[in-house]
Regions:
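C-terminal nucleotide
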Residues: 1-118, 133-173
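Short beta-strand->loop micro-motif that forms the acidic, two-metal-ion catalytic signature
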Residues: 127-133
């Protein structure tokens, strides 16, 4: 599911600030960009970075590792494992990168509560949409549960639509 919070992105300032923070963290760690830091490098990063920069770096490093693992999980058809990664990514975006919003957090929690395999904020954050990995037979019930929960929490009723993953863009032989 794609869950549009109907919140306009407010990331002009927030996204620019996160970018500056990540660039500063990379500079202090002596790398070109944080994606170069392995998970094992986070312990060293904790000793070198101020707390906020460490949390930003931890999000980027751990999310990079999650993306790599997600490729393997999708190839093997492990949708439950993929769902766990999506949810872990959302927690990292919310807690370490601080780019989620209460409406999106509500949608993610409602999707998970309704049985989604996983859910997370998507895009640059600070508004926008989330996605939820849902079994086909649970699309309608999950959509209804999310819309109701978000509205009951005092946010605009989100626009929700079902999508299907595909092989992506490719070149015909």
């Amino acid at each position: 599911l794609v869950i549009d919070s109907l919140q306009r992105h407010t990331h002009a300032a927030g996204y620019a600030e996160r970018r500056r923070e990540c660039e500063e963290a990379a500079r202090l760690l002596g790398v070109g960009f944080l994606g170069e830091v392995p998970m094992s490098g986070l312990e060293r990063a904790k000793t070198l970075l101020p707390e906020t920069l460490y949390r930003r770096a931890r999000h980027i490093v751990s999310d990079t590792a999650r993306v790599r693992l997600a490729v393997d999980l999708m190839a093997s058809g492990d949708m439950a494992g993929l769902g766990e990664l999506l949810t872990a990514s959302h927690a990292s975006q919310r807690d370490d990168f601080e780019c989620s919003t209460p409406a999106i957090d509500t949608a993610v929690q409602a999707a998970l509560g309704a049985g989604a395999l996983g859910a997370r904020l998507t895009g640059g954050g600070f508004g926008g949409a989330s996605i939820a990995l849902v079994r086909r037979d649970q699309v309608d019930a999950t959509s209804q549960a999310v819309a109701d929960a978000v509205e009951q929490a005092g946010f605009p009723r989100p626009t929700i639509f079902s999508v299907r993953a595909d092989g992506g863009a490719h070149r015909d032989a």
